[in-house]
Amino acid sequence: MARIAGVNIPTNKRVLIALQYIHGIGQKSAREIITKVGIEDARRVNQLTDAEVLQIRETIDRDYTVEGDLRRENSMNIKRLMDLACYRGLRHRKGLPVRGQRTHTNARTRKGPAKPIAGKKK
């Protein structure tokens, strides 16, 4: 089992699919990585040599923000919006939808479970 960017990559899967187990690498990024390193699509992780795994690791470290760094960057961006007290920051603070969705009905995922109101029975 290869370990890249702090993540154990599954050995029996194709390299293109296995790289997507790393947070911050999707299908497009994985394809770019294997093209840069020169690995064909059909290869599986258990068929990679140590040198190829090292090349993949170096490419990811050099060109991509992944895992903990990406999560930290995202949370810092949200914290910055909240500190600025701009509209988006206030919506994040209140736990409401940020991108203009309606809240009179719906938005239950963001707002949490419905709170019962006294005297509202039929």
Curated annotation (Swiss-Prot):
Biological process terms in GO annotation: translation
Alphabetic keyword roster: Ribonucleoprotein, Ribosomal protein, RNA-binding, rRNA-binding, tRNA-binding
Pfam family name, one: Ribosomal_S13
SUPFAM superfamilies attached to this UniProt entry: S13-like H2TH domain (SSF46946)
A GO term, aspect molecular function: structural constituent of ribosome
CC terms in the record's Gene Ontology section: cytosol; small ribosomal subunit
Region entry Disordered, spans: 95-122
Gene3D superfamilies cross-referenced by the UniProt entry: 1.10.8.50, 30s ribosomal protein s13, domain 2
Domain of life of the organism encoding this protein: Bacteria
Chain's role: Located at the top of the head of the 30S subunit, it contacts several helices of the 16S rRNA. In the 70S ribosome it contacts the 23S rRNA (bridge B1a) and protein L5 of the 50S subunit (bridge B1b), connecting the 2 subunits; these bridges are implicated in subunit movement. Contacts the tRNAs in the A and P-sites.
HAMAP family associated with the record: Ribosomal_uS13 (MF_01315)
Protein family: Belongs to the universal ribosomal protein uS13 family.
Quaternary data: Part of the 30S ribosomal subunit. Forms a loose heterodimer with protein S19. Forms two bridges to the 50S subunit in the 70S ribosome.
Protein name: Small ribosomal subunit protein uS13
Species for this entry: Caulobacter vibrioides (strain NA1000 / CB15N)
Origin organism lineage: Bacteria, Pseudomonadati, Pseudomonadota, Alphaproteobacteria, Caulobacterales
